[in-house]
Amino acid sequence: MIRSFAFTTQGRLHSKDIDTFLMPTLLADTSLFLWVDLEKPTDDETRIVLADIFHFHPLSIEDCVMFSPSPKVEEYTPKEEDRFWPYLFMVIHAVDYSRKDGVFATSELNFFLGKNFLVTYHEVPLRSVQATSERCLKSTVQIARAPDRVAHTLLDSIVESYKPALDELSLEIGDLEQQALQNPTRETLNKILQVKKEVLHLRQIIGPQREVLARFARGEFKLIRAHLVPYYRDVHDSLFHISELAQAYTDSLTGILQVYLNMSSNQTGEVVKLLTMITVITTPLMMVGTWYGMNFKAMPELEARYGYEVATAATVIATAATYWYFKKKKWF
């Protein structure tokens, strides 16, 4: 699906849902800014927009249509034989966390950012793209005056989308902590390890993404106007805070795992303690039973009138004495 918008330099909507054969004409008009959004496009739509209209470099087109596990930004400057305009190609990931499945769902968003155009490409619907397009059409602050403004709004929306996911993750970690303290089971351990794996996956996404935004925050690219650099820096700072939260969650999960192992060790120790107590307390009974269970005829106690009573009394007294000694030592 292709959605397209043309805005004036004052941020007002000029036209939308533009026919592809008209896009080159609008691109040539420097008083307009063209935003083309490709959402799960067909091969023909991809070829027409990326190759035939904008003439993007084949390597960036290949990176766009193929899933890229790591965020990145690349600057393309045309040579004499090239037909494209200078542009930035960027790969960014949005995330969503499902407590039901316990996994982070990653969605890739690709940017082609030029002086008077922005092309976005994604395989699944993204709330950040939808929200930004609605803001461009309805907002009174006229954010659609230039592509670098809209790109900033998109990036800010993507980074903000991390926060609900982290809130869900925080609730999940809190539940795991309670389970580890109150009723640790094998399922609790599996859940701790799974969530820790997902947090590590999140940090692997955020790390390169921070590097990408840091380059914008430092003002490395000429296509980002100087007065917008502080806004990109603010987005980078927000992502840095999210990165710190992810590190804190990793530390929390490590602590919860240690609590689980300690609780499991304590439970095992209690079982061993109980079994040891039973074994020691019943030792006198076993000794007396074993002694008088020998099949020797010449055992005077076997013929004694009160032999049974004496053996029983000895067993009871020895068992009681053992129990009293353990109790005095506070071994149970």
Question: Which role fits each region the language model picked out?
Answer:
Residues M1-H227, Y231-D234, S238-H241, A248, ...:
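Peripheral, non-transmembrane regulatory/ligand-interaction domains of membrane transport proteins
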Residues D237-F332:
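Hydrophobic alpha-helical transmembrane segments and their immediately adjacent juxtamembrane loops
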